[in-house]
Amino acid sequence: MGNDCAFTTIGDPMTYSTCGYLLRALRRVLPELECEIVAGVNSWSALAAASASPLVEDNGVLRIVPSYLRPDSPELHRMLETEGAVVLLKTYRSRNEYLDSLAGEEYDLLYGANIGLENEFISSDPEAIRERPDEYLSMLMIRKGARR
């Protein structure tokens, strides 16, 4: 007791992260636990900045969604009908399904993987995106009527 420790994570420490689960477990066994969480720049903001693409403007709504939401889901399509952006996180398992589902629609798509890392990849070209390997640290930003 009385020792300090640190936990580091890749990604967003308090958004769909192991950090949140670990913190909850630690607080169950150590209710007096003191902790400090230092947030960095979240991945979707980093993608928007790296690509010079505004996430939302004016009355647009920003939705951050884990990619468990299926590409053909009515819920996803309802989200996409409103002005703003939907950012799907961790799209490594379903990226191509999203691309297939949204092909021919009037959406602005932007894919980002490993943002801020040496092997960062950003593209709005569906074919270039399809050629990428599955990447855990990946996201797909979808906007209706976007202005770049």
Predicted regions and their residues:
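A contiguous loop/helix-start segment that scaffolds small-molecule binding in enzyme catalytic cores
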Residues: C5, R78-R148
